[in-house]
């Protein structure tokens, strides 16, 4: 297989290598014969190589010979008609067909001429193949059809031609995705229009994740597609019904609004609210103003939560988004109805947008929420205060969670000035000093002592049986991570 050539469309290199292993090229000596009848011989391979290079003079010369075989193939299965479809040569597709070329031939990867023409938007070639009777429902290894490929590429005329030829509108590839999903995710509104007019299934959802074409469009920020689907009657407040959560699957109850927010498509999110989306919907476990905290400052770990923060699309900054959402009815003090303290994690139930902003020591967001009317003293259902959250209560991944030492110190100062008690104890027997120890931030320990935290209030065991000293010496969820500087800071703080 010629890996120095452009690899076959739609096939990632990993797949190509895998298939190369599954279908090894046969090597034969000059005195041997191959059992593959149509495999091009050394003597006749020249014209087929010309077709690969889009030079059809050699093909024309070869066609004059009585021995010409229009279905000769290269080791990977590529034939002249496949190259004609790839290079958008409809006249050669017609000539080769007249010479006996199989229009439904496929490579070892089950790539047909029509799928090639559809994927590359080669309209004249695709229409020629359809007119000559090519199978419009051919499938690649992943069961991708020409309609899906054309929908993703965006040529609405090819999509229309395939529909008129009787293609199955709602055929599904191996992951359960349809042509409408591919068009919606790619933002090809013209293809979406044609598919909708033809009567495709708008409500089809993937079995595990519950994703629909509507949700794909929201996740990818495809505003034009969103508007077309709304005009078609999609419910702006519909949510996914997840059968198998975790990993890369979304949370159950995610709406298009939440997909847009968490993917960084903030202009689209505002547009959805203006079109009727509920700015206080928390069926996914969180509301838009809660989610903006991790859109601005990513979570932790080598997992989906630890992915880089999304790139904000459009011209709407995250803080301007918050302001507009509040103007459109978002409750700045909305308290979460779901959640629990899993292990040592912070309990989100009862948390407000300000509470989550404090958790990440996001000073700018905290200041804006205060300006918009946030109550800085609202605790979660465990009575964990914003001060405790900023200090580090709930931190399990040292050095990976949002908030630098400098940011945390500023947040602690702000929160105490706003009325948060540095000596408060929550229902899990946690204090702000326990949080500072969990972060391994000696600066936060000293700052809390400076702000009035006294050892009589914090030098005790939490629900897990750990004092701040125990935590600083390494007792914490996961691996042991002692911090001698934090231990020293706690010793200093205990003598205040």
Regions found by a protein language model. Give the residues of each.
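Ankyrin-repeat-protein effector appendages
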Residues: 32-47, 198, 232, 275, ...
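Ankyrin repeat A-helix N-terminal signature
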Residues: 49-54, 83-89, 116-122, 149-155, ...
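Ankyrin-repeat junction/capping positions
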Residues: 71, 104, 137, 170, ...
């Amino acid at each position: 297989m010629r890996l120095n050539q452009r690899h076959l469309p739609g096939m990632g290199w990993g797949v190509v290598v895998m298939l190369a292993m599954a279908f090894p090229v046969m090597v034969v000596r000059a005195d041997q014969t191959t059992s593959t009848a149509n495999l091009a011989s050394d003597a006749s391979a020249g014209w087929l190589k010309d077709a690969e290079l889009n030079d059809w003079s050699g093909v024309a010369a070869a066609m004059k010979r009585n021995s010409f075989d229009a279905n000769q193939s290269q080791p990977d299965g590529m034939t002249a008609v496949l190259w004609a479809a790839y290079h958008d040569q409809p006249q050669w597709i017609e000539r080769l067909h007249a010479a006996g070329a199989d229009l439904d031939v496929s490579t070892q990867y089950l790539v047909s001429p029509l799928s090639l023409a559809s994927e590359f938007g080669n309209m004249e070639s695709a229409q020629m193949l359809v007119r000559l009777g090519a199978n419009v429902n051919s499938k690649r290894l992943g069961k991708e059809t020409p309609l899906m490929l054309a929908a993703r590429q965006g040529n609405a005329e090819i999509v229309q031609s395939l529909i008129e030829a009787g293609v199955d509108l709602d055929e599904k590839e191996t992951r359960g995705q349809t042509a409408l999903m591919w068009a919606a995710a790619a933002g090809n509104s013209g293809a979406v229009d044609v598919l909708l007019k033809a009567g495709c299934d708008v409500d089809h959802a993937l079995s595990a994740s519950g994703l629909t074409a509507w949700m794909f469009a929201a996740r990818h920020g495809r505003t034009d597609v969103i508007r077309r689907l709304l005009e078609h009657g999609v419910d702006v407040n519909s949510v996914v019904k997840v059968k198998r959560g975790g990993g890369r699957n979304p949370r159950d109850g995610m709406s298009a609004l939440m997909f847009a927010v968490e993917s960084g498509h903030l202009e689209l999110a505002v547009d959805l609210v203006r079109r009727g989306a509920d700015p206080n919907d928390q069926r996914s476990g969180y509301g838009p103003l809660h989610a903006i905290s991790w859109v601005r400052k990513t979570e932790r770990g080598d997992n989906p939560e630890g992915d880089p923060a999304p790139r904000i699309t459009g011209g709407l900054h995250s803080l301007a988004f918050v302001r507009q959402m509040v103007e459109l009815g978002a409750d700045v003090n909305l308290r979460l109805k779901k959640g629990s303290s899993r292990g040592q994690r912070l309990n989100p139930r009862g948390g407000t947008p300000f509470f989550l902003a404090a958790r990440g020591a996001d000073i700018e967001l905290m200041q804006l929420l205060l300006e918009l009317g946030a109550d800085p003293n609202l605790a979660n259902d465990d009575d964990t205060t914003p001060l405790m959250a900023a200090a580090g209560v709930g931190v399990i991944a040292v050095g990976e969670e949002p908030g630098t030492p400098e940011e945390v110190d500023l947040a602690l100062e702000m929160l105490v000035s706003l009325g948060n008690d540095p000596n408060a104890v929550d229902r899990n027997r946690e204090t702000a000093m326990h949080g500072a120890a969990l972060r391994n931030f000696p600066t936060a320990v000293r700052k809390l002592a400076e702000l009035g935290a006294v050892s009589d209030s914090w030098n005790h065991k939490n629900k897990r049986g750990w004092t701040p000293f125990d935590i600083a010496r390494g007792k914490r969820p996961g691996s042991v991570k002692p911090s001698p500087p934090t231990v020293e800071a706690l010793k200093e703080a205990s003598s205040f």
